[in-house]
Amino acid sequence: MKSFVCIALVAFAAAALASPTNVASATGSTGSSVTTQDGELEGVTGQGFGDLTRLRKSAYGGSSGGYGGSSIPAPPCPKNYLFSCQPNLAPVPCSAPAPSYGSAGAYSSPVATYVAPNYGVPQHQQQLYSAYVPQTYGYQY
């Protein structure tokens, strides 16, 4: 723990020595010369090492705010456009009209099903299965 505190103090002292501070003086010329030297060190007057304005402007085309401005604003996306917001597409209706059953298409009746318990059973064994077939409603086996 003592070594950690010592390392932290040494790092703090090194950081304090590395960055020059503006010492108050009787004349203001010393402060302005320090500022001028800092500007010459950084290459651009008024920008610090931590300022990323130049990088941001070069990466996003010179826009000052947000993620960069676009030169052409995007049109609002209307509803019922198929797959895209481009203005050259025709609007698609919500449901295609059908001639006979509203918008759900033509009604088709269910496929007819018949009870055929003897399907695939040989003729001589059909009497064995007759007990399981209902004998009412016209089913005569």
UniProtKB/Swiss-Prot annotation:
<keyword id="KW-0732">Signal</keyword>
<keyword id="KW-0765">Sulfation</keyword>
<keyword id="KW-1015">Disulfide bond</keyword>
<dbReference type="InterPro" id="IPR013135">
    <property type="entry name" value="Vitelline_membr_Cys-rich-dom"/>
</dbReference>
<comment type="function">
    <text>Major early eggshell protein.</text>
</comment>
<feature type="compositionally biased region" description="Low complexity">
    <location>
        <begin position="23"/>
        <end position="36"/>
    </location>
</feature>
<dbReference type="GO" id="GO:0005576">
    <property type="term" value="C:extracellular region"/>
</dbReference>
<protein>
    <recommendedName>
        <fullName>Vitelline membrane protein Vm26Aa</fullName>
    </recommendedName>
</protein>
<dbReference type="GO" id="GO:0007305">
    <property type="term" value="P:vitelline membrane formation involved in chorion-containing eggshell formation"/>
</dbReference>
<dbReference type="Pfam" id="PF10542">
    <property type="entry name" value="Vitelline_membr"/>
</dbReference>
<comment type="subunit">
    <text>Interacts with vml and Vm26Ab; forms part of a disulfide-linked network within the vitelline membrane of stage 10 egg chambers.</text>
</comment>
<feature type="region of interest" description="Disordered">
    <location>
        <begin position="23"/>
        <end position="48"/>
    </location>
</feature>
<keyword id="KW-0964">Secreted</keyword>
<keyword id="KW-0272">Extracellular matrix</keyword>
<dbReference type="GO" id="GO:0060388">
    <property type="term" value="C:vitelline envelope"/>
</dbReference>
<feature type="domain" description="VM">
    <location>
        <begin position="71"/>
        <end position="108"/>
    </location>
</feature>
<comment type="similarity">
    <text>Belongs to the vitelline membrane protein family.</text>
</comment>
<dbReference type="GO" id="GO:0048477">
    <property type="term" value="P:oogenesis"/>
</dbReference>
<feature type="signal peptide">
    <location>
        <begin position="1"/>
        <end position="18"/>
    </location>
</feature>
